[in-house]
Amino acid sequence: MKVIATNKKAFHDFEILERYEAGLVLQGSEVKAIRAGRVNLKDSFVKFVKGEPFVFGMHISYLDSANPHFRPDEKRPRKLLLHKKEIDKLIGKTSEKGYTIVPLKLYFNKKNIAKLEIGLAKGKTLHDKRESLKKKIMDREARAAMKEYR
C-alpha cells in the first residue's frame, strides 16, 4: 500500500469513530496526477447527493504532460464507490447531529487501484483538541525517556 496523501487536519479537528475504504471514479489524467503526488485532501469532505457519496474539495492538480485541450476541473466533486450497506449506514449516521464524513488518506492498494480512506467523525471541542495535544506531547516525552534509558 503506497500512501499518496494524508489529511492531518482531520485527525486534529475530528474524533474518528469508524473507517471505510472507498474507490474513486477518476479520469486518466487525474490518476497520473495522483501517482505524481499532486493531490491535497485539506478541507475536503464527503456529502451525499441523491443517495450517492461524493467527495468535495479534494484538489488534484493539473498535470502538464496531459492533454492541454482537455483540462478537468481540479476541485470537481468525485464519486465514491462503496457497498450499499455501507452507504445506508453512513447516511443514517450523518443524519444525526454532529457526525460527518471526512477523507483521511489517499493511497494505491496492492492491485494499483486508487483508494480513499474515509472516516465517520465527530467534531472535537477546543478542550478536546488541547487534551489530545497534551497527550501527544506526554507520549513523545515518554518515548524519549525510554530511549535515553536504554
Curated annotation (Swiss-Prot):
GO terms for biological process: trans-translation. The keyword Zinc does not apply. One of its GO terms (cellular component) is cytosol. The keyword ATP-binding does not apply. Pfam families: SmpB. GO terms for molecular function: RNA binding. Disulfide bonds: none annotated. It is found in: Cytoplasm. Keywords: Cytoplasm, RNA-binding. InterPro entries: SmpB, SsrA-bd_prot, SsrA-bd_prot_CS. Required for rescue of stalled ribosomes mediated by trans-translation. Binds to transfer-messenger RNA (tmRNA), required for stable association of tmRNA with ribosomes. tmRNA and SmpB together mimic tRNA shape, replacing the anticodon stem-loop with SmpB. tmRNA is encoded by the ssrA gene; the 2 termini fold to resemble tRNA(Ala) and it encodes a 'tag peptide', a short internal open reading frame. During trans-translation Ala-aminoacylated tmRNA acts like a tRNA, entering the A-site of stalled ribosomes, displacing the stalled mRNA. Belongs to the SmpB family. This is SsrA-binding protein. It comes from Nitratiruptor sp. (strain SB155-2). The gene is smpB.
